[in-house]
Amino acid sequence: MSILEKITSSPSECAEHITNKDSCLSKKIQKELTSFLQKKETLGCDSESCVITHPAVKAYAQQKGLDLSKELETRFKAPGPRNNTGLLTNFNIDETLQRWAIKYTKFFNCPFSMMDFERIHYKFNQVDMVKVYKGEELQYVEGKAVKRPCNTFGCVLNTDFSTGTGKHWVAIFVDMRGDCWSIEYFNSAGNSPPGPVIRWMERVKQQLLKIHHTVKTLAVTNIRHQRSQTECGPYSLFYIRARLDNVSYTHFISTRITDEEMYKFRTHLFRIA
């Protein structure tokens, strides 16, 4: 079985929470844009996202007072390098996690962080995990600041400092489900967590031990999954997605996930920009 079969995502360009995969658009927008959708080939399009970003359609929507930007932001996957091995940006990553937070209503999506988060004021280093669990920590879902109880937390970090252009993406996942809670670090290259991450994990562990009896820290790094120079972003997002779908962290310890599977996973992550 392919690892992709263990998760609930699909190559559809619709956002994960859209159940009607025949169309990603709301019924109102479908109705208003029927004539454009029926002749999308004449616009040079083969997808709904292409249609609603076409200049002629955008001009028509503006005249009609239709908010197509909201459709793109909430009903479609994020734009990104879907059919190539382009490096993922922080926008690709954060926009994907924001969309997953719509589908997984107990997931706290934390904006990306660089590795000097102890010195720079990144959200990652300011989060109180007890407040996350109790629904007292602000997060952004569908463009709105909300507070809601969350039993999972995910963030993608870059191993470079904020003065650099980026080196390697890694994932943090906090699982506050079940009897034993865990604070997990995943690195597709198999490298151990650096000092700032170790200190962050220990600090969060002490926070959570105030409200739960068993909390452990895990470095899921015993296998070098990644062999390419491009897939650290997809691997990091895949780890978070797999854990949200209840794939155990032990799977990443016992089974190598290939770069080829991450090439395919890109079609699950993004719509064509």
UniProtKB/Swiss-Prot annotation:
InterPro entries in UniProt: Papain-like_cys_pep_sf, Peptidase_C48_C, VPRT
Keywords annotated in UniProt: Host cytoplasm, Host-virus interaction, Hydrolase, Inhibition of host innate immune response by virus, Late protein, Protease, Thiol protease, Viral immunoevasion, Virion
Native source species: African swine fever virus (isolate Pig/Kenya/KEN-50/1950) (ASFV)
Protein known as: SUMO-1 cysteine protease S273R
Gene Ontology molecular function terms on file: cysteine-type endopeptidase activity
Amino-acid positions noted as binding substrate in the UniProt annotation, renumbered to this chain: Q226
Domain of life: Viruses
EC number, UniProt record: 3.4.22.-
GO cellular component terms attached to this protein's record: host cell cytoplasm; virion component
Active site, per annotation: H168, N187, C232
GO biological process assignments: proteolysis; symbiont-mediated suppression of host innate immune response; viral protein processing
